[in-house]
Each structure stands twice: as structure tokens, then as C-alpha cells.
Amino acid sequence: MYNMMETELKPPAPQQTSGGGTGNSNSAANNQKNSPDRVKRPMNAFMVWSRGQRRKMAQENPKMHNSEISKRLGAEWKLLSEAEKRPFIDEAKRLRALHMKEHPDYKYRPRRKTKTLMKKDKYTLPGGLLAPGTNTMTTGVGVGATLGAGVNQRMDSYAHMNGWTNGGYGMMQEQLGYPQHPGLNAHNAAQMQPMHRYDVSALQYNSMTSSQTYMNGSPTYSMSYSQQGTPGMALGSMGSVVKTESSSSPPVVTSSSHSRAPCQAGDLRDMISMYLPGAEVPEPAAPSRLHMSQHYQSAPVPGTAINGTLPLSHM
């Protein structure tokens, strides 16, 4: 058996390549491999076994690629038992000892293959300008999507916390989600402002009388309602929020804060100038807005007395 292996392991005679004027790189590489100065590594047990098996499989399947033959040989080698591998392991040890005896100064130095540049490496911009730009755009889109998702989650949490399941305050959430453009002309603002102020005040009064837990649960949300609506009611709603949080009896303080005396004209003008741009507020429209805001501030809450006390129906 060993004699058969030795006959198979004899290196073939070096083939002399015809020195044509082609100058092919493959022929140069083959000449370098077959040069007598280069010392090959000793074969391991798998290479000793696969040497004869590869030749046999190549003869049986002439159209099979060498890589596919290597895969099949590796799978077959794993299926072999230790007793079947033993003679090939011993032969590999003998070849290694012989190799060390013939070449005592041999040291394995793996040759680094010079890989050809890929297309993306050939045509990249100098300084890596293309990749950072794409990463910046991707990052910006990701941040925008994350912020939008965070706002939607916050709105949904407010709605479910207050007991309104995406229906009671749907329109107000849409108005809060899309900020209004500051460049609206004064004429449209003067026409649309009384109707918008009336709707917001009605919603706020109904929410106070029906459910006090809405004001107690999310004061910031009600504050945003008042800021989205009339500027004249913003101070009253802010005061009611502060008093509702600090006092021990929220219903009494909230109703009394809405039925308090109207503010002075100068304070209301300062408050309007604080919430609206100065150039867009015409002076003739100011008395009408002051009158409307005073009217809604002095309007009594349904279900309360004139002095702001609770009705006696519970006694």
C-alpha cells in the first residue's frame, strides 16, 4: 500500500513551456510555481487521501469543476472513520519528517495575492466624498422618521390616558401636529379668529364640567389647546392649570378661575403682542378681539353659580 502511495506521490516531470511571444501572466505564474527554487509545503493527511480520489472523480465526471470536486472530497473525508484515516495520517507524518530533513531551514511564508481593484474602488471620489454624503442623507431621514414617530406616540398616549380613544379630540391633534404658517395675512386672521376661538372655548368648558380628570391628568395638553386658540384665553387657562395642580380641590378652583374678572386692556394688548407677531396685528382689529376675549372670559361655566361656587344639587 505504501509503495502505491509513493508511486502516486512522485512529482510529475516539469513541463517545458514554449517561449512564445504572448507574454501571458498565467504562464509566468505557472513558471514561478514549477520553478525548482521554490519549496512546496508537505502534504497533510487529507491531501494525501484526496490526491488519488480527485483524479478518479475527475475521470468519472469530466465536466465537473475543480471547486465542486473539492467540496465533495471534503464531505467524504469527514465521513471516514478514524481507522480509515490512520494510514493517511501516518503517511503525512512521514512526509513531514522527510521534508524537514531535506529542508531544515524551511519556513512557511504565505504569499499575499494581489487582488485586482473592484469597480467601486476604482471609481470612488477622492477623499471619500460619496460615502459620507449618502450616510448623512440616510441619517437625516432616520432622525426625521424617529421624531415623527415620537410625536405620534405622545399624542396617542395622551388620548388613551384621558379616556378618549382617537375620536374626541382627533381634529385638535391634527391641528397641533401641523404648525400654522406665521405668514397669514391680517384679514384672514381677523375673519377666522372669532369662530376658532368659540370652538376652542366650548371644548374647554365641556371638558372641565364633564371630566375633571382630563385637566388633572394632562395640564400641558390643555395649555396647548389654549395656546392654539385665542390669545386672550391663554392667561386664564394657564392660571387654571397652575391652580388645579397646586390646590387640593381642583373643581372649585378651576371654575372660579374661569369666572374671574376680566383683565385690563393694556395687559391683554401685551399678551396679544407676546403670542402674535407685531407686524401682523392691525390696530383697528384689536378692540374687537379684546371684546370677544373679555366676553368669553366673563362667560359663566354651565352648572355653576354667579360667584363661582358649585351647585347645591349634591346636598
From Swiss-Prot:
Name of one Pfam family that matches: HMG_box
Ranges spanned by the short sequence motif 9aaTAD, renumbered to the chain: 270-278
Which parts of this chain does the entry mark as a DNA-binding region? 39-107
Instruction: List the GO molecular function terms.
Output: DNA-binding transcription activator activity, RNA polymerase II-specific; RNA polymerase II cis-regulatory region sequence-specific DNA binding; sequence-specific DNA binding
Query: Any idea which UniProt keywords this protein has?
Result: Activator, Developmental protein, DNA-binding, Nucleus, Transcription, Transcription regulation
Supply the SMART domains for this chain. HMG
> Where are the annotated segments for Disordered?
1-42, 241-264
Compositionally biased intervals (Low complexity): 241-259
Which superkingdom does the taxonomy of this entry point to? Eukaryota
Which InterPro entries does the entry mention? HMG_box_dom, HMG_box_dom_sf, SOX_fam, SRY-related_HMG-box_TF-like
Q: Where in or outside the cell is it found?
A: Nucleus
**What are the GO BP annotations of this UniProt entry?**
brain development; cell fate commitment; negative regulation of neuron differentiation; negative regulation of transcription by RNA polymerase II; neuron differentiation; positive regulation of DNA-templated transcription; positive regulation of transcription by RNA polymerase II; sensory organ precursor cell fate determination
SUPFAM superfamilies noted in UniProt: HMG-box
Tissue occurrence: First expressed in the embryonic neural plate shortly before closure and expression continues in the neural tube. From stage 16 onwards, expressed throughout the CNS including the brain, with expression predominant in the undifferentiated cells of the neural epithelium. Also expressed at a low level in the retina and the gut epithelium. Highly expressed in the lens placode at stage 13 and in the lens at stage 17.
Q: Which GO terms describe its cellular component?
A: cytoplasm; nucleoplasm; nucleus
Function recorded in the entry: Transcriptional activator. Binds to the consensus DNA sequence 5'-TCATTGTTGTTG-3'. In cooperation with other transcription factors, binds to the promoter sequence of the crystallin gene to activate transcription in the lens. Downstream SRRT target that mediates the promotion of neural stem cell self-renewal. Keeps neural cells undifferentiated by counteracting the activity of proneural proteins and suppresses neuronal differentiation. May function as a switch in neuronal development.
What domain notes does the record hold? The 9aaTAD motif is a transactivation domain present in a large number of yeast and animal transcription factors.
* Protein name per Swiss-Prot or TrEMBL: Transcription factor SOX-2
Q: Which species is this record about?
A: Gallus gallus
